[in-house]
Amino acid sequence: MKVYKRLYELLGRGYKPLKSARLIKRGKDYYIGITLQKAVKEKKIKKPRYVINVDLNVQRNLACIGIFEVDWEKRESKLYGIKFVNGKLLRLVYKRDYLFEEIRKKQRQTGRSPQVGDNSRLWKKVNNLNRDIALKVAKEISDIAREFSEKGEVIVVFEKLKGLRGRKGRSKKLNRKINFWMRRKIQERVKELGLEEGFGLDFVYPHYTSKKCSKCGYEGERFSPSGSKALFLCKKCGYVVNADVNAVFNQHFLYLSHLLNGGGKARPVVRVGTSLKSPSREGHNLSGVPKATTTFFYISSLLSTF
């Protein structure tokens, strides 16, 4: 009988096994499932040194992560770096989408539901891939939070998930359900890791974060000149930036305004005309963050309560 190293790692970190266990059969193999538990105290963070804003895409870039360092005395926020979670993880997304398309083809040919025959087998693979992707994205986010927790208190901020709205077309509705499930799974896993690692988790309502220019505040639009990546173009100032990065900036501004107003109603606190420097290849090295492409931007956002 094989005993996985992961079990010893968890036991070494203070986890204790429950008395009950269960026997699991997968194919021709049998496994013993053991539930471990650990008592932790949730950490209340009111003035974090680092705010990590996360925009979950789960398609093009699985996640766009902005790491911001906050100086509460000077009321100044500085962007430490931007990281895209994609790379090898996107291969799992492509594999999942391929299987998903196979399910659709078989449904059109046979008229069978996903719970019958080959469709059921393929659907199990899709579910396993979704779970694997969600857990790995959550680990990427948590690795960054844990690294910066060594320097000061950290809060990871996600956009508040909205309820699913009905749309015409079964395929679109199903895609939305899958994406909603993945976002929720990622957030739940990051929360679990945060309780253990000591960093906080919070949410912000996505109030026009993807539609407004993070430089001047005017409304803009997305476009894809090469067909591979989405950019944001401001109709007023002409500012062009990666659309996910623009959303992360706006999300951060909203959350900082929430913190500076003592948890009150969020309102813009970044002065109109705040400069955003162009992307640079130079920057801090986010060590300990594997399998990802990192692009750095810099911003010094002057914060005021007006």
From Swiss-Prot:
For biological process, the GO terms are:
DNA recombination; transposition
Tell me which Pfam families the record gives: Cas12f1-like_TNB (PF07282)
Q: Which domain of life is it from?
A: Bacteria
Annotated residues for binding of Zn(2+): 213, 216, 234, 237
Which keywords has UniProt assigned to this entry?
DNA recombination, DNA-binding, Metal-binding, Plasmid, Transposable element, Transposition, Zinc
GO molecular function list? DNA binding; metal ion binding
InterPro entries per UniProt: Cas12f1-like_TNB
Q: Does the keyword DNA-binding apply?
A: yes
Q: Which family does it belong to?
A: Belongs to the transposase 35 family.
Give the protein name, as stated in the record.
TnpB-like protein aq_aa05
Q: Which organism is it from?
A: Aquifex aeolicus (strain VF5)
